[in-house]
Design a protein with these regions (language model features):
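Extended helical coiled-coil dimerization/tether regions that scaffold
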Residues: 128, 132-249
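Glycine-rich phosphate-binding loops of NTPases
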Residues: 54-56, 74-159
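Conserved catalytic network of the ASCE P-loop NTPase/AAA+ motor domain
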Residues: 58-61, 118-121, 227, 237-241, ...
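Conserved P-loop NTP-binding catalytic core
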Residues: 29, 38-87
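Hydrophobic/aromatic beta-strand patches that form the interior of the parallel beta-sheet core
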Residues: 28, 126-128, 297, 314, ...
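Acidic, Mg2+-coordinating catalytic modules of nucleic-acid enzymes
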Residues: 345-360, 364-549
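Switch/communication elements of ASCE P-loop NTPase nucleotide-binding domains
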Residues: 1-48, 198-348, 546
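Short glycine-/polar-rich loops that comprise or flank the Walker A/P-loop
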Residues: 62-66, 88-93, 120-126, 243-244, ...
Length: 549
């Protein structure tokens, strides 16, 4: 079971927000205070079929309307345990809340018929946030009951907890805020779920904690009279019983380092995909369940948490009217060949999902100097929210630009002028004045009378006096369609203009043959505002303008 799409009207800053979702995992990204955590809170209200507080209404005089499309069952022979004759695979409903109502009303979107709220309560929602203490909200009696059940199960499989571990549990009780049963549950689960690929204590501790949180919620559902568990259980054609769950995790980066963030999020997905055999066996023995079916929602401001697939991303952004909208990776329709490139390049552009505008450059030297150029020309990238991406070649710029534009990100791309004919009609594209970045730099520095400064940069980059070789000059002259015989090799500071040959060519030859991030940083640190080539400054200022729109 999973939510396929949702339309939200009049909830907080969501005047009219449409979203589509991936069936397995969805990562919500975007700027601060745009409504990502508010969305998770709304899911809680929807799945419990409860009204929100008056302060949650954008306009209290109008209702909040949430249109949902939910995939209930996977096949025509499946059914819910309490309605064996109902085989509806999907529903389209509207949940309508009014300030004056105690509970919301539920309608069938296709017929307009009012439905019982039990229909939407088939969705069960479990939320975790690093900023709140869900564990502390669970009554100690629940942990004690689980401790007894886990102890019986574990004793028949692994044996009792050793004395040294019991001493550690008592220490945690003395210094912590939980009953001893809470810590014993974690230790029991750590032994039950232990595998060869979970040898590190911290890995196992957090994985056990994740499992305990899920089991605790299922235990409370199983013992609840408000919504009987049978109302939620799906029975497949083979008689196997599955509990559908929607799990949300808010800001996992707060207490976890990057590797642990990814490990824990992947483990939650494994639980929802029933890939942990020990956990499935535990569900079977404790609750008579053969597994889970679920959907994961993650709100994060960390690129370390993000999955490397654009199809799992939901980016919230503001349109030109200031309204919150969503760009959903699951709804992008692209050809298979393009999709392959989008997935391949996505790891390089994850940080851009949090940006206000993006600059794409072709190579490493540009990448090394542009952020420093931004400081120099008065457009600091971090302050403006500008993301700089190295496309690692002209051919990748268009593909990365397309992906970013799918996510409604303003993009400025800088190409070398030698490919101008192929890209001149594209939107948001700029070109160097000379044939490439290195020519612009060499010409600008010499025109500004900064030859000595350029010599200093080159000498610092190579650790000795910069000089050109015959190979450098041949390569450069081939690019420029000049005769290398007009440019004898040697130290750059001795280079002279003769026979009408321009002086910037030897400098271009050296720069063209020594591209790299370190050189780029030296250039960025050394140039004054008036020395930044105009084509580069123009791109930076345009990115700054887009970031403030």
């Amino acid at each position: 079971m999973y939510i396929t799409q949702m339309r939200i009207k009049n909830y907080r800053n969501f005047k009219d927000l449409f979203m589509t979702f991936h069936p397995l995992a969805n990562y919500l990204v975007g700027e601060n205070d745009i409504g990502k955590s508010s969305f998770l809170r709304l899911i809680s209200f929807v799945t419990r079929a409860r009204n929100v507080d008056e302060i949650e209404y954008d306009d209290p005089h109008q209702p909040i309307r949430i249109d949902l499309e939910v995939q209930l069952l996977e096949g025509a022979k499946e059914h819910f345990a309490d309605t064996p004759d109902d085989h509806r695979r999907a529903i389209r409903v509207r949940l309508e809340m009014r300030v004056s109502d105690i509970v919301p009303r539920l309608y069938d979107l296709d017929t307009g018929e009012e439905l019982p709220l039990e229909t939407i309560r088939r969705l069960r929602y479990v939320s975790y946030s690093a900023l709140s203490q869900e564990d502390a909200e669970v009554r100690p009696q629940v942990y004690r009951a689980l401790e007894r059940r886990l102890a019986q199960w574990e004793a028949s499989h692994c044996g009792p907890i050793p004395q040294d571990e019991r001493c550690y549990i008592q220490h945690e009780v003395n210094v912590g805020t939980f009953d001893s049963s809470y810590y014993e549950c974690i230790f029991y689960l750590s032994r039950i779920l232990c595998r060869s690929n979970r040898h590190r204590a911290d890995n196992l501790k957090f994985i056990s904690l994740a499992a305990l949180r899920v089991i605790t919620q299922i235990y409370q559902m199983a013992n609840s009279l408000a919504v009987p568990l049978e109302h939620n259980i799906i029975v497949d054609k083979d008689g196997k019983r599955y509990l559908p769950l929607i799990i949300s995790i808010d800001e996992p980066e707060i207490h976890l380092h990057p590797y642990m963030q990814r490990s824990i999020l992947e483990y939650y997905q494994q639980l929802l995909r029933n890939e942990d055999a020990s956990f499935c066996a535990l569900l079977k023995d404790l609750f008579g369940l053969d597994g889970l079916r679920g959907q994961l929602f993650v709100v994060t401001h960390s690129t370390d948490s993000l999955i490397d697939d654009y199809r799992n991303i939901v980016r919230l952004y503001r349109d030109h009217q200031g309204q919150v909208k969503a760009a959903c990776g699951s709804s992008f329709h692209v050809k298979r060949e393009i999709e392959k490139h989008l997935i391949m390049h996505f790891p390089e552009v994850k940080e851009a999902l949090y940006a206000r505008s993006v600059i794409l450059v072709e190579g490493e030297t540009e990448f090394g100097c542009f952020q420093l150029f931004g400081q120099t020309v008065g457009v600091p990238f971090d302050y403006y929210g500008i993301c700089l991406i190295n496309a690692r070649g002209e051919s990748s710029i268009a593909k990365i630009k397309k992906l970013l534009e799918y996510f409604r990100l303003p993009v400025v791309a800088l190409y070398d002028a030698d490919v101008k004919e192929a890209h001149a009609k594209e939107k948001g594209v700029y070109f160097t004045q000379g044939i490439c970045f290195e020519q612009d730099l060499a010409q600008t520095m010499l025109q500004k009378g900064k030859r000595q400064a350029l010599d200093k940069i080159i000498d610092a980059a190579c650790g000795t006096t910069g000089r050109t070789s015959s190979d450098m000059l041949k390569k450069a002259c081939h690019k420029l369609q000049l005769d290398p015989q007009d440019f004898p090799p040697g130290p750059l500071y001795k280079a002279k203009a003769h026979n009408g040959a321009p002086l910037w060519v030897p400098y271009f030859a050296w720069l063209y043959s020594n591209k790299g991030v370190i050189l780029g940083r030296l250039i960025g640190q050394s140039l004054e505002k008036q020395e930044v080539p105009p084509a580069f400054a123009k791109v930076i200022h345009e990115a700054g303008r887009l970031a403030t729109v």
